[in-house]
């Protein structure tokens, strides 16, 4: 199971939905909508993902086709369609899945991982130029632990419990707060032998 975000997540197990999501622009759109709760037009979306409004309009329609987003109330004259997410996150379910679903899930996870590696590289490149309080605030850790399945579940639940109040859409953050990408992996390594 892979989670894009937690909270009120939509569970996805259908290969066609996973394939529809497995595009960097669509992932970026979904991440923005899920994390902010915002509603967005194709023109605004184009600025966000660096594509033309017609290209982003196509991506928005594809996301709507699978009910990942929906039309939001108009902002005024109704000439532009406004879109919003139908959930606060996505959970990719593969338990008991057939080979097509497993393949689609792996392709989708590859898009997530490529994006996360790119973000980590960008952080390392710009870290020396960050203001002093932020320069050492972030970090990356890679380690192995010896734990039971229950201990790993407990650890994951505790991390989610720590993070959730900070990512709450309605949180009144201090003025010096910035958006931060928080990513962690916790999975059993392949057993030797």
Regions found by a protein language model. Give the residues of each.
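Short alpha-helical segments that sit at the start of domains
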Residues: 2-28
């Amino acid at each position: 199971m892979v989670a894009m975000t937690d909270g009120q997540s939509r569970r996805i197990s259908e290969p066609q939905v996973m394939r529809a999501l497995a595009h960097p622009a669509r992932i970026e759109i979904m991440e923005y909508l899920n994390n902010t709760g915002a509603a967005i037009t194709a023109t605004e979306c184009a600025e966000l993902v660096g594509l033309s409004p017609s290209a982003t309009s196509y991506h928005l329609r594809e996301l709507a086709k699978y009910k990942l987003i929906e039309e939001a109330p108009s902002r005024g004259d109704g000439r532009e369609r406004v879109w919003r997410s139908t959930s606060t996150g996505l959970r990719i379910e593969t338990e008991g899945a057939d080979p097509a679903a497993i393949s689609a899930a792996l392709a989708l996870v590859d898009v997530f991982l490529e994006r996360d590696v790119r973000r980590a590289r960008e952080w390392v490149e710009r870290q020396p130029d960050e203001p002093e309080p932020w320069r050492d605030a972030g970090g990356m850790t890679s380690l192995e632990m010896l734990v039971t399945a229950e201990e790993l579940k407990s650890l994951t639940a505790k991390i989610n419990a720590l993070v959730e109040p900070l990512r709450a859409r309605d949180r009144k953050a201090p003025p010096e707060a910035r958006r931060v990408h928080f990513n962690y992996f916790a999975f059993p390594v392949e057993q030797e032998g």
